[in-house]
Regions:
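N-terminal amphipathic, basic-rich helices that act as targeting or association modules
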Residues: 12, 63-66, 71-103, 107-114
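Ferredoxin-like iron-sulfur electron-transfer modules
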Residues: 1-4, 24-34, 61-74, 217-218, ...
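Glycine-rich ThDP/TPP pyrophosphate-binding loop and its adjacent helix/strand module
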Residues: 225-231, 240-255, 261-349
Length: 349
């Protein structure tokens, strides 16, 4: 989706009468609505499928971009370097993702009424998002992981009780066994199909049964598929104010993913220096150039020996960025991605 950076308007040209002229021009929202863009928007949302991947796979840049983004049209600054990472995360994992968002830029463009950018697919599934305080977001996301694990454990226990019962219908047992066979690999297309069959069988069985175990399974049926927990925030949160929480969460070894949107300054409050700011960089509170080194949080995280650590810059290498996100999601343990993001606070014209 467009980030409003304006590069296409500045750089894309066409030959008009032997002279190069802009191929695109800026237009106001009111003018585009008057020209019929509302109808076009209905076509894109209501008629087109959620993904048009064809033979492309989600593990490629091209394939992933042919999926519906479940984060779109944010109110971030023009050309924001953070939003492409959030959009990629929602595009890859959005149907099952739970996001704990630290206060900062990403909480402003991510959850400020009325421009809430998180959306859902045609099945009504999309990211679950919540914003905590600046100083406890890592712990907040860790709590989400613990809650998911507890709900999945309870669901498994209730399903096993039903499967052990002589009174449960055979078709219900077959459907539940099918869903449980994908318990440890629950996000594949085959697993999702089995889970949907189980949900349908549960709903059918409930029509003629008041079994408390079955009611509980129905309440928890969304947890047949494990949730993807992402803890998101900026470098001011990760390197400074919330670092203690991140360190504690990484040390627990649980399956959480941390995305650090690293602009190397406190972007939301005007571009002040953080511990992520490189040596000699000029920023607010470091007008003469920052005298100390950038905190090497990646090495600090690697010292645990069981944390997946990646450093990415989408503008430098899209394939490596994709690979890092997919590997972090696939790793059954704590992962942290440091995502370099250009920012308007850098003052680059």
């Amino acid at each position: 989706d467009c980030t409003g950076c304006g590069v296409c308007v500045d750089q894309c040209t066409v030959n008009k009468g032997g002279k190069l002229a802009p191929a695109l021009t800026w237009s106001t929202l009111e003018a585009e609505r008057a020209a019929g863009e509302n109808e076009n928007e209905k076509f894109f949302n209501d008629v087109l499928p959620d993904n048009v991947m064809g033979s492309n796979t989600i593990t490629t840049v091209k394939g992933a971009m042919l999926r519906k983004p479940l984060f779109e049209f944010s109110g971030a600054c023009a050309g924001c370097g953070e939003t492409p990472y959030v959009k990629l995360m929602a595009q890859l994992f959005g149907e099952n993702v739970m996001i704990a968002n630290a206060t900062g830029c990403s909480s402003i463009y991510g959850g400020t009424f009325p421009t809430i950018p998180y959306t859902k697919d045609k099945n009504g599934r999309g990211p679950a998002w919540a914003n905590s305080l600046f100083e406890d977001n890592a712990e907040f996301g860790f709590g989400m992981r613990m809650a998911v694990d507890a709900n999945r454990a309870l669901l498994k226990q209730e399903v096993e009780t039903i499967l052990a019962s002589d009174k449960a219908p055979a078709d219900l047992k077959d459907a539940l066994n099918g869903a449980m066979s994908h318990w440890d690999n629950s996000k594949t297309p085959e697993a999702v199909e089995a889970q949907n069959k189980a949900k349908a069988a549960i709903a059918k069985a409930l029509e003629g049964c008041g079994c408390e175990h079955l009611k509980k399974v129905s309440e928890l049926s969304d947890y047949f598929c494990d949730k993807s927990v992402w803890i998101v925030g900026g470098d001011g949160w990760a390197y400074d104010i919330g670092y203690g929480g991140i360190d504690h969460v990484l040390a627990q070894g649980k399956n959480v993913n941390i995305l650090v949107l690293d602009t190397e300054v406190y972007s939301n409050t005007g571009g002040q220096a953080s511990k992520s700011t490189p040596t000699a960089a000029v920023a607010k509170f470091a007008a003469g150039g920052k005298k100390t080194y950038k905190k090497n949080m990646g090495f600090m995280s690697m010292s645990y020996g069981y944390v997946y650590v990646a450093s990415v810059a989408m503008g430098a290498d899209r394939n490596q960025t994709m690979k890092a996100f997919l590997e972090a999601e696939a790793y059954n343990g704590p992962s942290i991605i440091f995502a370099y993001a250009p920012c308007i606070a850098h003052g680059i014209d």
